[in-house]
Amino acid sequence: MTERMKAVAAAGAVAAFWLAVWVFAAVLVAQPLILPGPGAVALALLRLVCDGGTWAILVGSGARILGGLALAAVCGGVLAGISSRLRAFARLVAPALSFVKATPVACVVVLLLIWLGSARVSIAAVFLMALPGVYFSLAEGLAQVNKPLEQMFRLHGVRGWRLFCAHTWREVLPFVLSCARAVIGMSWKAGVAAELIGMAVGTVGERIYQAKLLIETADLLAWTVLVVAASWACERVLVWLLRVSGPVAWRAAVRAHGHGLRGRAGAASDGAAAELALAVGDRAPWAPALDGLVLNVPAGGRICVMGASGMGKSTLLSLAAGECAPCSMVFQDARLVEGSSALDNVLVCADARVDASNATTLLRRLVPGIDVHVRVAELSGGQRRRVEIARALLCGGCAVILDEPFTGLDAAARDATAEAVLDLLDGRTLLLATHDVVDAQALDISDIITL
């Protein structure tokens, strides 16, 4: 028996157990008005399903509930986005939403009935009940976005909607999925409760109230089954759509690579080299070796920064990158989208003139025998390093900045990689940080700054 068959059998056994409990309880009570048996409820459910009016009512209530949920998602996303940038705004909004979150649904519905009337009460109730859950989940997700990876994307010219698709949405998506599983079911409960309390005409809540007045317990349970089924179906569909949205957003960002590359501080938008002048001043007080340092790199020049660990080499390169962004950079720490392929990691930051064929050729030159479609998480440290170098070489911008680029490579791999860097530098400025003079020699750099 397969695992799937075992799971189905286990679920069937659980359902049979609770059905038996229901039958036993109904027989024990012996009063259909209090607890009808499964047969009576099944007949009532069949009658409702065969009635076309039932579906119109269910669809109408569902549309209002989903409308309130969609409004909460939009407003919660906007509020969370603002809160992630402005701490004062977050401190202002959080108490109000925490209060709404703790308020009983009945109290909210009664207030909404006074303010809005019964026609719009379900939409407003769902909105208010879902908004805190959406906001706090998105705020937490945005607070935990991988900042170093975001820095890498921005530096390589991936901004705006492409940054959102390639990075932000993928980082926040697990929090959104967790929120959706909790909020969708709660929204159906809040919406139906609002309809019931407000006695809105032509709604599921009204039908449940009528069943209660007429003591039609079987109909009441049948409507409950329909609401639970509708809530379950909505949750499954929406969660599936959210899961699919992650890969779809990533593919959109990869296909649109090279869009929006614009430099500043003299950086040429066409990728031509530009002069780099950097006065560190007091911008790096934690690195005394950089105090007062002035870095001047002529257009197309090559400079190596050497020094012991902790002297500020990486800090200097980061400051330089900020002056000429967008440019390409290999960071000292690995910055890759682990769940995506080596090819996509290169293409997402690549110049618009680069296609999959160019990227594949370079990857296979740097990493002989590589499967470019394999996830980078499955590659060795040296292979991952060369994927980052390929990404840097195929990115637009006016400079290539390499921070300890040959870490994890043997001498042969280092020399082959350095040769590829020189072949594809294309006149751009090259800035290298290393502790090994051999790296500078491999890249034909004679101008060395020692910290």
Model-predicted regions and their roles:
Residues 356-371:
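Conserved ABC ATPase "signature" region
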Residues 375, 404-405:
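Walker B catalytic motif
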Residues 375-379, 383:
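Conserved ABC ATPase signature
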